[in-house]
Amino acid sequence: MAKKIIKSCYIWDELLMAECDRLPAVAERASRVHSLIVSYNLINKLQVVHSSPALYEDLKLFHSENYLEHLKTLQKVDDDYVIEIHDEEFGIGYDCQPVSDMYKLVSVIAGGSLAAAKSIILGIADVAINWFGGWHHAQRFCAEGFCYVNDIVICIEKLRLKFKKVLYIDLDVHHGNGVQDAYNLSNSVFTLSIHKYEPGFYPGTGSMDEVGNLTGKGYTCNVPLHESYNDETMEYVFGKVFHKIYDSFKPDTIVVQCGADALAGDPMGGGGLTIKGYCTCVKNILDKQKPTVLLGGGGYNFSNTAKLWASITALVVDVELEQNIPEHDYWPLYGPDYIISIQPLLGRDKNCKADLDNCIAKIEDNLKFVIERKTIKHKTEQNEISTCKNLKETLCKRQKKLQIKENNVLIIDESPNNDVYNFID
């Protein structure tokens, strides 16, 4: 297949970055990531798209009204705020600390991934990058694992207005349980998660035995790995599994969660990857030339996370980064070497080839359900998935109003009166 020129966009705006900087587990990480991307002049190679907060109806594509209404009550949270039982019922507490203006926070974060989906749907980009998204643990009824909103599921639901089959790939060191749970019964969204799986390691799910249920049987794939898995292991299993899933499922579009906490040196990970391991996986995905959304996720060594996501951005726009990191506001935090590469883990990879091959064989066996079954539209437990009567006709008659600004900035007008999508209850 001849190499295709990729149209790529980068979701960014001041509000989106500022809200992500407020997330307690990754405070100011968003600014560090964006600043590194800017310092390498990668912005000049990308169409910048400004997002706007998600509408209530968009958030309800996945989350329950009770959960959303509770988030609206968390308006002013200070040091004297006492977590109540009602908060804990919705997952607000230990790992998901209460934050002021919580509903605004989740609306803005979800809006970023919605902008990525709309950029793909409208043909603005073949690859949409949103490093501010990727919160894969949030459940329909509650926050979980540092994730207050499952922007990934909302993004996928928006993509399904146009694309029949969506392949979701999760590269985070933690299992993508929230997304898997959302599509456990679906045979139009295939979920693949490659992650660390050890006793006591969060979230405790993601075994090979979790393959989906009923009409979704065979459409969930987990590759559980022991700690310290390195580039060689990741590239081997991904190279084997991804192509088999792709050929069996034949997706129309792909969503990738690029959580950076599987990098060597992450304080909450336990993986042993370098930038090379991640980029090899992403390159395999991009080579399929399908419309693709790239999202962020975990990553608690903020400098390494910024290095990884800047490197993946460079891969998308076909730029080779200089090893020496350019001077910018966060440059002192990249010491003592100030280079873009990440040192591999010195410890031994605890995964053996025999176990990996056994896992791959089981995955191949499960894929027979995908090959044998025709894909049908999945309807969520919450409500009938919103659909578009005739997307093509709607796009022609009610084009999205776009404003082209200087410096390749594109603003998607999110006014309900101008929204191109007609939702049906």
Which stretches of residues belong to each language-model region?
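A general "terminal functional-core" signal
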Residues: M1-I11, L16-M17, H70-D425
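N-terminal low-complexity, Ser/Thr- and acidic-residue-enriched intrinsically disordered segments
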Residues: M1-N66, V77
